[in-house]
Amino acid sequence: MNSNPLTPSAAAPVSDASASLTPDQFRNPFSALTWVLLGCALALAASACALWVDLPLAVWIKQSVSEGVNESFEWIGELGESGPYIGVALAFYVIGLVGLARGWRNPVRMSYASMARGSLLMLSTLAVGGLVVLVLKRSVARARPELFFEKGIYGVGESFSRAQLYNSFPSSHTYAAFAVAVVLGILAPRWRWVFLLLAALVAMSRLVNLDHYLSDVMTAAGIAVLVGHVLAPRVLGAGYQWPLRAPWRWWKK
């Protein structure tokens, strides 16, 4: 008898079609070296934008975008709020664990194991990358575009000072949107480009609303892609059973 109720052996049988909704044998599309090179390329591109593109682009947006367009993109920017995604993912994770423990039959075409793994990947990607973004925001302390247009300030302030409007780099809304898009794209590859398009609209809203510079949103999107693909094999892989256990049992063999 299985002594741990929150393991795959307690799950109800599911069809092959439902099990395929989560790619249990997910593998990164690139090697570790390729990811490092892509990260370096992103850092160089962001640096180039900060030197030569960010400010001219922000000035052009300020002069060219109408108030109606600005207000429309404010609504789009709401899709970058991480709170609702965390709440939904947490609810699905709890349902997945309970369904596994009690051997429920899932009324939808998805196993409870897939539900638990997918929702945990969402939570972990938002949490891990969100922490990286927070540390960068506090340490870099980049002035937001608002400070340039009000006081002519373009650059960085004192690290970890928590000064208002010195937390532009990178964009947390863009990170949340791309983190969700990357995870959903991994779980539902056929819809990958739809999710990424929605995330790109959120990133664009941060530029149009003059909340961030181009390098802020570029870096946030890159972090989301990297974190999501690094975590996916360790959460979705069939060889890793910890996602199917309650959090207080993650470290138990």
Region locations from a protein language model:
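Interfacial segments of alpha-helical transmembrane regions
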Residues: 95-96, 102-135
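Membrane-embedded catalytic cores of phosphoryl/pyrophosphoryl-handling enzymes
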Residues: 23-31, 98-99, 152-253
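Lipid-exposed faces of alpha-helical membrane segments in multi-pass integral membrane proteins
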Residues: 41-45, 83, 87-94, 124, ...
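Membrane-interfacial segments
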Residues: 56, 61, 96-107, 139-144, ...
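N-terminal transmembrane-helix/juxtamembrane module of multi-pass inner/ER membrane proteins
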Residues: 2-93, 138-154, 160, 252-253
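Residue-level signature of transmembrane alpha-helical entry/exit and packing/kink sites
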Residues: 32-39, 114-122, 217
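Alpha-helical membrane-inserting segments
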Residues: 54, 92, 132, 136, ...
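Alpha-helical transmembrane segments of integral membrane proteins
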Residues: 75, 86-87, 118-121, 190-197, ...
